[in-house]
Every structure is written in C-alpha cells, then in structure tokens.
Swiss-Prot record:
Any GO BP annotation: tyrosyl-tRNA aminoacylation
Keywords, sorted A to Z: Aminoacyl-tRNA synthetase, ATP-binding, Cytoplasm, Ligase, Nucleotide-binding, Protein biosynthesis, RNA-binding
Sequence positions that bind ATP: 234
Lineage: Bacteria, Bacillati, Actinomycetota, Actinomycetes, Mycobacteriales
Domain of life: Bacteria
Motif residue range(s): 'HIGH' region: 41-50
Protein name: Tyrosine--tRNA ligase
Location of the protein in the cell: Cytoplasm
PROSITE patterns: AA_TRNA_LIGASE_I (PS00178), S4 (PS50889)
Domain (S4 RNA-binding): residue spans on this chain: 360-417
Amino acid sequence: MSGDIIDELTWRGLIAQSTDLDALRAALAAGPLTLYAGFDPTAASLHAGHLVPLLALKRFQRAGHRPIVLAGGATGLIGDPRDVGERTMNSSDTVAEWARRIRSQLERFVDLDDSPTGAVIVNNMDWTGPLSAVDFLRDIGKHFSVNVMLARDTVKRRLEGDGMSYTEFSYMLLQANDYVQLRRSFGCRLQVGGSDQWGNIIAGVELNRRLDGESVHALTVPLVTSADGKKFGKSTGGGSLWLDPEMTSPYAWYQYFVNTADADVVRYLRWFTFLDREELAELERATAERPHAREAQRRLAAEMTTLVHGEQHTRAVQLASQALFGRGDLRELDEATLGAALREAAGEGEVARVTPGEPATIVDLLVATGLAESRGAARRTVNEGGAAVNNQKIADPDWTPADGDYLHGRWLVVRRGKRNMAGVLRDGN
C-alpha cells in the first residue's frame, strides 16, 4: 500500500529530522496512517516555502495514507516566535479571513474525497476557541517544563535581546494540543512540518505521551534555501512569492523558477515535483552537459506553474516568454498575462506611461522606459537598427505609435537590442 514512502522521502532529501524511523516505517506498513501538517494564516496567502510540507502530505496520500491539513485560525492569532522580534498582532476578523482564503488554497493540493485516504481540512480555532484559561493551564500547561521551553534556541535568542511576550512563549503549548486533539478525533499519529518547527512538534509528541500514554511520530522537511544561502521564495521586487495570483502573477511565478541557479535546480525538482528518478537523472545530466539550454529550469518552472496555477496559465506564460523576446506573436497574449509580464520586467520601477493626444516618438519611448540614457543615445540605437516596438524594428527616429499599435489598446513592448525590453502603458484606456 505505502510502497516505501520513507525511502522516497530519503532519496529526495526531504527528511531533516524525525523520531524513530524504524518505528515510523512499522506504523506506515501496518495500514493507512493519518498524518497532519499545520499552516498558520499570517498573511492573506500561502507562499512558496509552504509547498514543501504541503507536498509532503500529498506524497503520503499518494502512498496510501490520509492527510489532515490544519489551518491555524487560533495559532495564527498568537504567532510562532521568530528570531527577529514580536509578530504584529492582527485582528481576529483579519486572521479569520486569511484562514478562509488559505483553506481554499490548501484544498487544491490534496484529494478531498470519501476514500480511506481522503484528506480532511480542519481549523484549530474549533477546539482552541472554547478552551478556558483555567483548563488550558491545568490540562495542558501542567505538562510543560519552563526550563525546557527556555532552552529553545529561538527563545534564548529573544531573551538575550528585547525579550518575548508570554503570548508567543505559549505558542508551543497550543500547537502541542493540536496534535493531541487530532489524535483523539482522527487517530492522527504523525505530524509533518518544516525543520524550524521541530521543537513545537516534539512538544506535541511528548504531550500525547504525558496526557494519554500514546506514542506518536514526528518528521520534518528541510527549509528551502539556495546554494549560496539566500532565503528561498523572494520575488524580483523583494517580496514573498505568493501562491495567490493576485499577489504574485503566474508570469512572475514562472520567471522565478526559470531563473533558478544550476546549483539549486535539481534539488528543487526533487523537493517540489513528483518526477521520478529517471526523469530527474536525465535533467541532472542535461544541466551538467548543456547548462546553457536550461532544460531543468524550464521543466521546473512549468511543473511549478501547473501545480499552483494550472496548465492554462503555464501555456500562457510560456507563450509570453517567447513572444516578449521576439519568438512569438504578441497579439496572441491575453492582456492579464501581457500586463503582468511587463510589470515584472519593470522590477521595482514603474511601467512607463504615455498620455493619449501627446505624441511620443520611439526616441521618447526609449528614454521614458530607461532603455536609453539620453535622447542622443536613443537616436543612435534607432539608427543602428537596435530599436523595436512589438517585435517590429523601427528605423525612423521620428516614428510614433498609431492607435492600432497598442496591444489590447493599452500596451507597447519596446526593445533595445535582443535582451533589453520594457513596457509602455497608455493612460486613459
């Protein structure tokens, strides 16, 4: 039934820490195991870093086990302690709305059906909300040693700095209680999470033992960083790489992964996709022998975009990538994809704008987009054959766009040479 999911996770490099693996293998072999991972609504969307534990649940489900996905409506109000200081306290209404939005994202990654492996989605506010302070302190707090809690690395670092509120200090107890409640209600016996959650997860293992004399398991997946130690999942503009397409466009998502470094791409393929060993070995060979072709990066970007946004968006962004660099018809692109691509190309800057009724020549456009430093440089670019609009070369420095030149009535794609491209947006449309 399970194949050997532990071997699968091991060769993919997806086990950071665990309780006794032999005991876990035995539990998995005995029949369908129920496991869970939790995701706190600390923003309106999950981000790319959440995918590793979320996909781990999916891998277990494919191997014949039942995942529980927990949206932390209660723990999201408290906040897991960080090294960098207290989290902002968001309102109950805000966290509830974020939990609702995140739940809809979580539902896309696991199979919700009536089979023995059908996933369950829960919110820990359902059992934490009714819990009184007295019951919390007597029934849960009694089983925790303050000395052990103070020994956590994050707690020690915070106490050496500006300190920590009791609110965040108590987060571990709430997460531990989640594990107890899920075991009691669903027979859950494995918690999966990021390696930064190890202390909280082990607290849940211990609380199950202390309260009910029950033995349960824990497994963490690695936190994702690049080979040079940079934090994974930051977009071009420096913000998080969100799963919500309104917060990170499918085009920006695709471009992030297609620009993955050679040193990271095979590891990311192991962690983020379901490609088998043979496919991964071939892509690893391609990266070593033909790095310029970026076959592994393009496959990673396609797999990740399809996973999060669907095949239709993958095809659209691939078409946009080709068309924007002169290898396709820009007029075939839908406006949302075209606009997202041109805004992404602007990075942290603003997309250049033109006002209807105020003629702008190709020289004006090159300067406005920053593709030329001066009007003289722009003229030289045109005279040397290096200027193009919508993939059509422009040879006249006095050329101005007609209404029909604007894609979807709004956009121009201006290029200097083969690799330097920017968008121009016409106001008032």
